[in-house]
């Protein structure tokens, strides 16, 4: 008499399937954990080297952050739909004009990186409305935001002459307050006394 065929079904396959799924889940979690640790380790913070990037200006030219090495750079990440960004834009322009019109002007720059998806169509009316004269760059795919690991807009990074992040500011500021204008002037003068490629700020 032929013995009955063994029952095929989930009872025999389930343990193996469960083990395989568990192993895959553990591997994925370990991989994500390593990625998260790696991202935290390179998060740009004050004292760290500012990550280089390139982006397109309104006129179509490509600009790299490293092209401005030797200047103090205010990197402002913003969007036209952001109300706090709109509130601080006039004071950024006033700060720009005050310092650029003085003896330290050639050593100072503001880069405003827009994360607007529509880029030029959204930014041009904003630029005209507030009479912005500093360079505006487009980051519609969010690459610069990811590099700098921003959590919202506006976020601003002050980068010294040596290319290191001096300060990180989350949220809007009244950028042309007298004490801030003097602080920026001090950072520019301080950097001028150091050779290019010198140490990071303390």
Which residues are covered by each model-predicted region?
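Short, ordered coil/turn segments that flank beta-strands lining enzyme active or ligand-binding pockets
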Residues: 58-59, 161
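N-terminal targeting signals for export/organelle localization
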Residues: 1-52, 178, 199-202
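Thiol-/selenol-based redox modules, centered on thioredoxin-like
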Residues: 31, 155-202
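Short loop/turn microsegments at loop-to-beta-strand junctions
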Residues: 50-51, 73, 153-155
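Conserved helix-turn-beta segment immediately C-terminal to the redox Cys motif
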Residues: 71-72, 87-113, 128-129
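Short active-site neighborhood of thiol/selenol oxidoreductases, capturing the structured segment around
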Residues: 63-86
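Short, internal strand/loop/helix patches
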Residues: 111, 116, 124-162
């Amino acid at each position: 008499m032929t013995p009955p065929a063994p029952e095929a079904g989930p009872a025999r396959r389930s343990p193996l399937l469960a083990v395989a799924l568990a192993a895959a889940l553990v591997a994925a979690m370990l991989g994500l954990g390593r990625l998260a640790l790696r991202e935290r380790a390179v998060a740009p913070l004050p004292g760290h080297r500012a990550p280089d990037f390139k982006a397109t200006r309104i006129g179509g030219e490509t600009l790299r952050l490293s092209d401005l090495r030797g200047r103090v750079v205010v990197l402002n990440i913003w969007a036209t739909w952001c109300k706090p960004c709109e509130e601080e834009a006039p004071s950024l322009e006033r700060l720009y004009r005050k310092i650029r019109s003085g003896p330290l002007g050639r050593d100072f720059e503001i880069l405003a990186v827009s994360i607007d998806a529509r880029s030029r169509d959204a930014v041009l009316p904003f630029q005209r409305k507030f009479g912005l004269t500093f360079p505006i760059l487009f980051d519609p795919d969010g690459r610069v935001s990811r590099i700098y690991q921003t959590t919202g807009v506006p976020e601003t990074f002050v980068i010294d002459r040596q290319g290191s992040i001096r300060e990180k500011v989350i949220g809007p500021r009244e950028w042309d307050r007298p004490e801030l204008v003097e602080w920026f002037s001090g950072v520019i003068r301080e950097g001028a006394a150091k050779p290019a490629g010198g140490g990071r700020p303390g």
